[in-house]
Amino acid sequence: MLRSLSFAKKILLAAALVVVFAFSCFILYNDYRQREAVRTDTENYLGEIGTLTASNIQSWLEGRMHLVEGLASQLALLDQPDEANIARQLEQPVFSRNFASVYLGEAASGTFTMRPYDAMPEGYDPRTRAWYKDALAADRLIVTEPFVDAGTGEQILAMSLPVRHAGQLLGVAAGDMKLETLTAILNSLKFDGAGYAFLVSDAGKILLHPDSGLVLKTLAEAYPKGAPNIVPGVHEVELDGSSQFVSFTPVKGLPGVTWYVALVLDRDTAYSMLSEFRTSAIVATLIAVVGIMLLLGMLIRVLMQPLTDMGRAMQDIAQGEGDLTKRLKVTSNDEFGTLANAFNRFVERIHESIREVAGTARQLHDVAQLVVNASNSSMANSDEQSNRTNSVAAAINELGAAAQEIARNAADASHHASDANHQAEDGKQVVEQTIRAMNELSEKISASCANIEALNSRTVNIGQILEVIKGISEQTNLLALNAAIEAARAGEAGRGFAVVADEVRNLAHRAQESAQQIQKMIEELQVGAREAVATMTESQRYSLESVEIANRAGERLGSVTSRIGEIDSMNQSVATATEEQTAVVDSLNMDITEINTLNQEGVENLQATLRACGELETQAGRLRHLVDSFKI
């Protein structure tokens, strides 16, 4: 799918991925920072609220502890610590306003005096109660953990302090406090319904809790999946499938006990603002991506215009009319400008090479046409030579008949000698004409050989030019391959350049294939030219032999003429001369027959040469057609 996308779309896709990745990283980082900030703010908030709540509880308890200490001091100063005086001290309004009850358990008798009065169970002995024994053991004011009152059955909290009168232990004075005030202090922390507060001891026992079912239970029972450690700070726990923040703040200044105010806040509620911010950030990211893509698309369209023009020019050369006159307009000095300059230089070199090949192809076509014309002329001359040779053969036959007639009729020797003289003169002229024709044929064959040799040399030059073209194609292919390798090393940023390099390499490969086809045609043309040269050389050799034979025939006809001229003076040796003449005529007839045979072979060779020249002309036309496919 990615291969079918254009380079600009790939850049847009990559940019979109980069922008989305960058904004995603920003959102994640900002979410992390916001989460940390919210957690820090939550910790600070819970710490401040916990400290304030612990301080309120501490202040409330310290005021009651001062009242218990004052009660103990008043009881210690009694002149007569009897029950009436003790009751009088316990009945003071300040105690009734701040305590549910105040009382004294005497050490000596176990008497229990309480105001307001409330009947205790039968056999009740204060000296066996925890508030009594713990205060006596500590020998100072203590605060007990909440417990169930033996008289009312209510959950209360007690403060007790040993009382000494005149150096002797009088008993332990104590005050009971109901937990409504502490519960009200804790329940005032609602956190808009997202949390609550409770009181816990350092041992993990829950002293006060909005859920009454958890009072006096341990944290392990309240948090079965993992109880938080009771140390100052904020902890994250899981309860009923939801995560909660739990902070512990110690209540300072309590003698004998260590209590902590525990604040619980729902984590999702604390992070609710983050969800809104995250949604807003995602929407902003989508808007930013769309806007950036639109702007980047327009910018890429402008920046990619040189590359688009380059691709269109390459397509015109590869699939259009092969117009090598087109050049790219260089408007910048960047990578596109460098690539455009390189493309223009490459097309310029191809243009010059094709132009030279075109000129050579035209010259080759012209030379081939000249060779064809010369071969046609040679064919006409060969026909004329054949006719002349037939005439000579007929004359020789007549000469032989005349010689036989001389032998049969010596009386008519002079007359026949005269006729023979005339015929010999005619034969000599024919032979001289034949010699001249053979010389002209030899010269034309020599010229044809020279032209074919020149044609062969030019085809070699064309082959050298094609070798240069093939070298250029191979070098271009190598450069394109190196460019593709460098683009692969550059990764996504170099894919567009890799596509261009691949197209250049394809063009170089096609140019190399065309050069190889032309090279093959030139090689076939060279083979035909060499065959034509060999044939013309053979024809020239036969022509020279024909000239030599014709010269010999001329010489012999001259001898015949001279002998016929002497017939009148040598009539006595007619018989002998006639026999010699017959032998010479037979020999001449054989020579003429051989000349005729050689002439026929020469005609056949010329026909073969003509066919080779026609093939040469055809190949030259094909080469010219291939070159004309380019616009130069």
UniProtKB/Swiss-Prot annotation:
Kindly list the residue ranges recorded as spanning the membrane: 11-31, 280-300
Name the keywords, alphabetized. Cell inner membrane, Cell membrane, Chemotaxis, Membrane, Methylation, Transducer, Transmembrane, Transmembrane helix
Q: Which intervals carry biased composition (Basic and acidic residues)?
A: 413-427
**Could you tell me which residue ranges are on the Periplasmic side of the membrane?**
32-279
Per the record, ranges on the Cytoplasmic side are 1-10, 301-632
Residues annotated for 4-aminobutanoate binding in this entry:
124, 129-131, 150, 176
Q: Which residues form the Cache domain?
A: 37-262
Q: Which PROSITE patterns match?
A: CHEMOTAXIS_TRANSDUC_2, HAMP
Q: Which membrane topology term applies here? A: Multi-pass membrane protein
Task: State a GO cellular component annotated for this protein.
Answer: plasma membrane
Q: Is the Glycoprotein keyword given for this protein? A: no
Locations listed in the record: Cell inner membrane
Molecular function (GO) terms listed?
A: amino acid binding
Q: Which family does it belong to?
A: Belongs to the methyl-accepting chemotaxis (MCP) protein family.
Query: What else is on record for this protein?
Result: PctA has a broad ligand range and responds to most of the proteinogenic amino acids, whereas PctB and PctC have a much narrower range and show strong ligand preference for L-glutamine and gamma-aminobutyrate, respectively. These receptors are paralogs: pctA gene duplication in the common ancestor of the genus Pseudomonas led to pctC, whereas pctB originated through another, independent pctA duplication.
Domain comment, as recorded: The ligand binding region binds directly to 2 L-amino acids. Binding of GABA induces structural changes of the chemoreceptor.
Describe the task this protein carries out: Chemotactic-signal transducers respond to changes in the concentration of attractants and repellents in the environment, transduce a signal from the outside to the inside of the cell, and facilitate sensory adaptation through the variation of the level of methylation. Responds to L-His, L-Pro and gamma-aminobutyrate (GABA). Also involved in repellent responses to trichloroethylene (TCE), chloroform and methylthiocyanate. Also mediates chemotaxis to histamine, but does not bind histamine.
Supply the name of the protein: Methyl-accepting chemotaxis protein PctC
Q: Which organism is it from?
A: Pseudomonas aeruginosa (strain ATCC 15692 / DSM 22644 / CIP 104116 / JCM 14847 / LMG 12228 / 1C / PRS 101 / PAO1)
